[in-house]
Amino acid sequence: MKIGAPREIFEGEARVAMTPDSALQLQKLGHHCVIETGAGMKAGFSDEAYAAAGVEVLPSAAALFEAADIVVKVRGPERAEAERLRRGQTLISFFWPAQNAELLELCKEKGATVVAMDMVPRISRAQKMDALSSMANIAGYRAVIEAGNNFGRFFTGQVTAAGKVPPAKVLVVGAGVAGLAAIGTATSLGAITYAFDVRPEVAEQIESMGAEFVYLEFEEAQDGAATGGYAAPSSPEFREKQLAKFRELAPEMDIVITTALIPGRPAPKLWTEDMVSAMKRGSVIVDLASERGGNCDLTVPDQKIVTPNGVTIVGYTDFPSRMAAQASTLYSTNIRHMLTDLTPKKDGVIHHNMEDDVIRGATVTHDGAITFPPPPPKVAAIAAAKPREKVKELTPEEKRAAEIATFRKQTVSQVAMLAVGTALLLFVGMYAPPSFMAHFIVFALACFVGFQVIWNVSHSLHTPLMAVTNAISGIVILGALLQIGSGNVLVVLLAAISVLIATINIVGGFLVTRRMLAMFQKS
């Protein structure tokens, strides 16, 4: 089948749904790729690059819609684009079906199948197709870069000959994909980073990234997690505590990045006008929720404004498009994974399996019918765990008796082994020469000490332990090499085996050491 990517006609959109690299992968599935001329130009992909990847470049959108069996886009289709769809054709793009009922109806009437990338279920198997997370990751990163562009100081603290520069203080509100990306970027730039989220389970994630989680003093336990990893609306009491905490933090923060969204609702207002007034001159607010009304009272969508007290508020809604090359690469990879699932036999034929949770969840029209909203994903039933028998609590006297019994058992075992070993040594000593006994005793002690040392090493330290054994193996191989010149055939054979085994250990040890050290290198 032919997969076509038209040029995005939404104003300011620079992304493209197919890159030369993704086109090569799609062709391996048996598909033929076409693209409208100039579609990838804003993202840095020329028509020549597509042609070199085996993609047919068509002169117009009309020609592309006519030729393609599957149309891949970034933005949802404009009405003029939807009018070009035909029965049996498949459209894969962001669609937002809940907000575009008329467009959904038009696609149904046209008989086209629409796969909405924003409707991909939030389940583990579908992570490779989760375009929302891919774009949110870019938005969080770009938000910090945009804040730094409008902030008049360093992120990291510095001590210079000209004086001391304090580090910037950054507050990230909302620790979803975009929020975590912003936290990671701000922390890596050296800023003192704080983060807040209504879901208490993300506190550990935030702290593991080097940021400080902002806790609220709230009597009732508030869990703001909803289905799909999103946040749920907060209670009025919790919201008041939340706003009070933000008012307390506002005068201290240099940069505030807000990312809070609730599915199907306008963005919650979390940074009020009085908080903006309390911020220092030169501070920056980046509102990633501006497309849904914004988390800040003063946000103006698609604009950057400066308040009378000198606070810059960035309300851009096209952060991923501002990194068009990277965004196009990630989005086209998400599209490729979706098409891989739609082409299970890799024969260039789409098989739209509506029994598949991911495909069913993302499909909003199919066979002339609207299939939105989808049913909840099927979850495999898990058998209830058998109740464990309660372990009887031992009294101090019973614990003491058990410890004594264990000690006696171990003592008897060790004394018996010692007696047998002593008898064996005496027996061998009666017939063996003194030189042999000296070597044999050293060997026995080495085995005993080595066993005790290795046995008591924690499992987590076995990898560095393998690296250290290179030195021991080096001693073994030297001893074996000295014995290879012996006139005894048996000694030579044993020495050769020793060299082989020690060599394997040395090579393996160096390999493990290399891999262990590579974990600490920044790629």
UniProtKB/Swiss-Prot annotation:
Subcellular location: Cell inner membrane
Annotated NAD(+) binding sites: 127-130, 177, 197-199, 229
Group of enzyme by EC: translocase
Main location: membrane
Catalytic reactions on record: NAD(+) + NADPH + H(+)(in) = NADH + NADP(+) + H(+)(out)
Family assignment from sequence similarity: Belongs to the AlaDH/PNT family.
Name used for this protein in its record: NAD(P) transhydrogenase subunit alpha
Species: Cereibacter sphaeroides
